[in-house]
Amino acid sequence: MWVLQALAIMLSIQAGTLDLVETPPVVGNLPVAMPVPLNLPVGGLSPPVLKGPVNHQMLPPKRPVPPPKGGKCAPAARYFLSSDKLHDYLMSTLPPQIEDMVKCDEVNLEGMLADVLNTVESSDLLSLLDGISLLKGGEGGGLGIGGLLGNEGNGDSSKPSSGSKATGGLGQLIPGGIPGTEALGGLLNLGGDKSSGKGLLNGDGLSKIKKPLEDAVENVSGIKDAIQEKVNEVVPDGVKEPLNDVLKMDIKDTLLELKVGQVTLDDMEINMEANGMQVLSMLTATIDGKGVLGPVISLLQFEAKMDVMTTIAVASNNTQCVNLDAQDTHMHVKEMKIQLVETVTGKVPLPVPLPLDQIIPAIVTAKINENLEKSNSCAIVLNDFNNCKNNTGLFSYQVNTARISPKGLVILYCAKANIGNKTVPVPGGRLPPDPKNASIAVTISSTTLKTLVKEVAKNSSVQMDGLEAQITHIAFASQENNTLRVVYKVDITKNGEHFATGETKLFISHGSKISNSTLIPDVKLIRSEHSVVPPEAKEEVEGILSEVGKVAWSNFNETYKKMNIPVGVSSHTLKNSDVKLMKSIDLQAAS
């Protein structure tokens, strides 16, 4: 009995091996590959258990289990757009939208800055400056005293400041650091979590930041004289005395109105990733202070260095259309400066802007990100990438998958043929790769052409001279010079009985083009060849064989003229590109 049990186990293992290498339906006509050996554990198979009955549930089903209904079909067409084209589109589309987003009323950058200035008890200009940055030595200082931008050593001001550096200058003024600094945790996070910064200004979040800011203003008085002395070293003698009054000026009492003026894109970096695109925009925004009172200053200007990080992914409505979607956007105010732009006498008392303490842009960052998240009118919209019009014709295409990779955008489509009054599913197949260095490419599976020809053949039966002819088999082959060879067999009956079998070869030249998502057909019948079995019936069936060839070619030619291709992306289409007939009989065009 144990011999039978061991044999049953061996059979189950062998059956499992066959299931693993079962040929998929889409490649059923290809040569059958040799079975792939099982990946067995290093220690070998466990010895069979000989006690008890055989577990018949281990045996695989005799027939392959069909895929569940509603599953995705195999792709029958593909559209490709290179990463260079995507980069060019974003570089031309994003800058004006990002600049408008910074100016957007619902983001309210100027209002948030005013709110922050109103949270401190002592808001004279000298108290709001970044004292550590102004006093620090090294290169890059705008006043010639180093460290003007508030970065450590030779730090690059164009790079986003980390959370520790955002409060570093102020923290050094307060023994033991800034109390409540933990409230800034995650404030400057530019990616991933869409809710970054959310809730920071609600509850006790703002109070934890406001308190150290007020404490810092009180403690900074110890170095005010040193700051003022350093600033006076770089200004003309004629404005030193008025400047002292300016530095003691209370911003809250003098600013009547703030408004975002000019927004300039300094640089933009686009990274293509496996699941989308990351866009980092570096900007400079000026915020003008109008209506300033006093005998010296008539116009103030704040300058904000900002980063805007945007995540862009593919959005599909599971029909024919694929678009780009700006899914996540975060703003980061890296630093803020104040510029004394204009005086009553027309003189500019300071040659460069003075940096504000870095806790101020940190709080502004949190506030504007909350506003952006709640906004309905400040979002980035990329709907001009694809107009998403329905594409009707001989074939209906539906998006199978769409993804972005470092190479570019790839859209795979399922297809159905609309022939006569019925819809015929087009079986998918393995598609050839896109041409190297292609910017745009469209590939149509050979299964679409085969589906078209087979459906045409069903409507090409002929009756004449007491004979009836019907096409029973079709084969395809690609020839040189973009030529397609179609071979079909014809069953000829006489008086209801089989009389002869004819074979016809059609040689068709293919010179079609694709332009603006439209196939411009150009197919010509070069020649045809006929043969008959048995040969003695040739003379009697030559007429009907010739007629079948004429009807089949006419039907194919008229139907092929209605053939359409997937649109892909309407803003990036092929222009008068030749359609190449591949050896696999797939159709491909590229530019």
Swiss-Prot record:
Keywords: Glycoprotein, Secreted, Signal, Transport. One of its GO terms (molecular function) is lipid binding. Glycans are attached at residues 421, 516. Residues 151-172 are annotated as: Disordered. N-glycosylated. The N-glycans consist mainly of complex sialylated and fucosylated biantennary structures. Its main location: secreted. One of its GO terms (cellular component) is extracellular region. It is found in: Secreted. Expressed in lung. Not detected in other tissues tested (at protein level). It holds the Pfam family LBP_BPI_CETP. One of its GO terms (biological process) is sensory perception of smell. Residues 1-18 form the signal peptide. Coiled coil: none annotated. InterPro entries: Lipid-bd_serum_glycop_N, Vomeromodulin. PANTHER family: BPI FOLD CONTAINING FAMILY B, MEMBER 9B-RELATED, BPI FOLD-CONTAINING FAMILY B, MEMBER 9B-RELATED. This is Vomeromodulin. It comes from Mus musculus. The gene is Bpifb9a.
